[in-house]
Amino acid sequence: MCDDDETTALVCDNGSGLVKAGFAGDDAPRAVFPSIVGRPRHQGVMVGMGQKDSYVGDEAQSKRGILTLKYPIEHGIITNWDDMEKIWHHTFYNELRVAPEEHPTLLTEAPLNPKANREKMTQIMFETFNVPAMYVAIQAVLSLYASGRTTGIVLDSGDGVTHNVPIYEGYALPHAIMRLDLAGRDLTDYLMKILTERGYSFVTTAEREIVRDIKEKLCYVALDFENEMATAASSSSLEKSYELPDGQVITIGNERFRCPETLFQPSFIGMESAGIHETAYNSIMKCDIDIRKDLYANNVLSGGTTMYPGIADRMQKEITALAPSTMKIKIIAPPERKYSVWIGGSILASLSTFQQMWITKQEYDEAGPSIVHRKCF
């Protein structure tokens, strides 16, 4: 435990779906909870419960039946700052139980995050939470650090957004970053839709969470989609059952791999975009010809939506088909990749060489929020 150390840095990875927070130097986040803020749908139904006007994270999740749930981060980018402040407040005071004014804080951001957004993050940290120092790091770069590399291409796919980010010697190459607004939340929505075709109805925000659980427990990526569809049609070997909270048991078959197949064929949900294998290839092709070999050999997967069984083999197969025939292609899928952004942040914030990189309160007071563009890149 490093709580005795007065100035341990905090690392907070704000994902669209989950907040991962903890102390620099730890090997895993202390707190992982949903990035949701829930407000009661009806006034005063819980008599004597000391009605609150809002609930955050797990508490919102457990009371979801009587709440309307909102996600303040959409597609990796913060859209609702009031709710975001509630989430940060909950992170510091309830989850980590620290006083933010005593700890330098490392936050993460999506690649290609709008400039105004990072300024606003900086402003809230210094003015609302009075942190002594802070830094904003790009999520994909942290994932690459966590895998022990400084060069490679990261496929980071979370709940709200998917990116292909080529990184050379620790610097993201912005001209070659590919962003795809298709990630875990869209897969959950799609699974809700195709389960409806089976006659199961999932509509409310609370029921969506059940579908998300089905997705996480039962879905996988097929190595060959057409073959798998044929297998599913001819036998019931791929069927699995799932028990709903009310005891009803539902059966799911080809939905198990049709759902994540959307990552490779976005046309399934009506998106006119290339799949994640093609965006990875396009991203590499936008990079200097001299570094492509290093990128092909270091394809790092990161984020919860890369946790499907079979995804690494499928990526290997698809990229091999696109790349030059002699190219060595390697997909790295670390087992802890759900949290690799946080782990990379924990590593970075505890390096002695990083300590002069923090934006201090003094620098912020002198230069204002725009300091973040000069110090964090």
UniProtKB/Swiss-Prot annotation:
Annotated SMART domains: ACTIN
Keyword Nucleus included in the entry's annotation: no
InterPro entries: Actin (IPR004000), Actin/actin-like_CS (IPR020902), Actin_CS (IPR004001), ATPase_NBD (IPR043129)
Similarity-based family: Belongs to the actin family.
Modified residues (Methionine (R)-sulfoxide): M46, M49
Keyword Transmembrane: no
N-acetylaspartate modified-residue sites: D3
Tissue specificity note: Shows overlapping but distinct expression patterns with other Xenopus laevis actins. In tailbud embryos, expressed in embryonic muscle (myotomes). In tadpoles, abundant in muscle from the tadpole tail with minor expression in the heart and limb buds. In adults, expressed mainly in skeletal muscle.
PROSITE patterns in the record: ACTINS_1, ACTINS_2, ACTINS_ACT_LIKE
Naturally occurring in which organism (per UniProt): Xenopus laevis (African clawed frog)
Lineage, broadest ranks: Eukaryota, Metazoa, Chordata, Craniata, Vertebrata
Identification of the protein by name: Actin, alpha skeletal muscle 2
Reaction(s) the record says it catalyses: ATP + H2O = ADP + phosphate + H(+)
Subunit structure: Polymerization of globular actin (G-actin) leads to a structural filament (F-actin) in the form of a two-stranded helix. Each actin can bind to 4 others.
Gene Ontology CC annotations of this record: actin cytoskeleton; cytoplasm
Chief location: cytoplasm
Subcellular location: Cytoplasm, Cytoskeleton
EC number, UniProt record: 3.6.4.-
One Pfam family in the UniProt entry: Actin
Listed PANTHER family: ACTIN
Miscellaneous section: Xenopus contains at least three sarcomeric alpha actin genes that are preferentially expressed in either heart or skeletal muscle. Due to the tetraploid nature of Xenopus laevis, each of these three alpha actin genes is present in at least two copies.
MF-aspect GO terms: ATP binding; hydrolase activity
